[in-house]
Design a protein with these regions (language model features):
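N-terminal hydrophobic or amphipathic helices and topogenic motifs
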Residues: 1-88, 106-109, 113-115, 127-132, ...
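Structural recognition of the beta-strand scaffold that forms the well-ordered cores
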Residues: 53, 99-101, 141, 180-182, ...
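Flexible loop residues that form catalytic
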Residues: 58, 102-104, 144, 184-185, ...
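Short helix-initiation/N-cap motifs at beta->coil->alpha
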Residues: 70, 84-95, 159-170, 301
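A ligand-binding cleft/hinge motif common to bilobed small-molecule-binding domains
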Residues: 92-107, 170-205
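Short glycine- and hydrophobic/aromatic-rich loop-to-beta-strand nucleating segment
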Residues: 119-121, 209-211
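Flexible hinge/capping segments at coil-to-helix
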Residues: 122-139
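Secondary-structure junction motif
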Residues: 139-154
Length: 301
């Protein structure tokens, strides 16, 4: 009996320490993101002013037709602080004011939301294990994507540069190219609608989605503090909900279809492969289980 008591007491102490640490962390995190006097005064002075934010209207999960994750961020910001916001439709590739910007280089300033990557898509179901499998193939893309892959990969493919997304999509439809090189999030709607096959991921070719701050330093500080809280509490739910809704729309799924998808308990079997799975004690890991974890979040939105 004494032995059991000796075991229980340390466990209780550990639990209390963890709980105390969590409370301290959350309290410190919350306090560090509370508005200071200057920020509160700025809000009071600008109650009748309108803050313009530049947002795209064609960026799938993040911003389409006034909906999406970045729209929800600014809607919640407006509701939290009573700031009137005007959403101005803008090109996400060239935006330099307060709003959403997408760039090939990781921003030194700004508030990072999401990191996208390039993929190769095809009309045919083909297995590509490594870049050398692309030798002799025709790969189409826009200037930025082709510049990346032609310099970063030692492959003897034919690269075809297109001036627009429309022309690139038509080239794939006409079989003028074997593969189209595209950023995954930007093209996920077309991939779903056309039933294109993602044949290869290029995770090192990235695009960064971030909130570009404006010229008003106090407003920037308000946005930054709200972002810290919102990203921690709301971002993941917003992202997966919007992604799920996009899949439902583009795949024309019915209510019955979605009920079948979300009501199941999925049992996944696997064989150990160090490249894709890992097993330590009773815990699983690796690339495969990372995908499965994301899928679980996706269907349980």
């Amino acid at each position: 009996m004494k032995k059991n008591k000796k075991i229980v007491v340390p466990i209780i102490i550990i639990i209390l320490l963890i709980a105390t640490g969590a409370v301290i962390y959350l309290t410190t995190f919350k306090n560090s993101n509370q508005l200071n006097i200057k920020e509160k005064e700025w809000i009071d002075k600008n109650k009748t002013s309108i803050v313009t934010v530049n947002l795209p209207n064609d960026l799938n999960v993040f911003s389409t037709d006034g909906k999406g994750t970045i729209n929800e961020f600014f809607d919640e910001l407006s509701k939290e602080y009573g700031i009137s916001i005007n959403k101005n439709v803008s090109d996400y590739k060239t935006n330099t004011s307060l709003g959403l910007t997408v760039s090939e280089s990781k921003p030194e300033e700004g508030l990072l939301l999401f990191t996208d990557h390039y993929v190769l898509i095809s009309k045919n179901r083909e297995l590509i294990n490594e870049p050398s499998d692309l030798n002799g193939k025709k790969i189409g893309g826009l200037n930025e994507g082709i510049a990346y892959i032609s310099k970063g990969y030692k492959i003897t493919s034919t690269f075809v540069t297109y001036e627009s997304d429309t022309a690139l999509a038509q080239g794939l439809e006409d079989k003028a190219i074997d593969y189209a090189l595209v950023p995954l999030n930007e093209y996920i709607d077309k991939i779903l609608e056309k039933n294109y096959i993602i044949t290869y991921h290029l995770p090192e070719l990235k695009k960064y989605y971030y909130i570009h701050l404006g010229t008003d330093e106090i407003l920037n500080s308000i946005v930054n503090k709200f972002y810290n809280i919102w990203y921690n509490d709301e971002y993941e739910k917003s992202y997966y909900t919007n992604l799920y809704n996009l899949f439902v729309e583009k795949l024309a799924l019915t209510g019955l279809d979605t009920d079948k998808l979300t009501s199941k308990t999925y049992k996944i079997g696997f064989t150990e492969n160090p490249a894709y799975t890992s097993l330590s004690g009773n815990k699983t890991g690796g690339i495969l289980f990372s995908y499965l974890t994301d899928f679980s979040k996706f269907v349980n939105t």
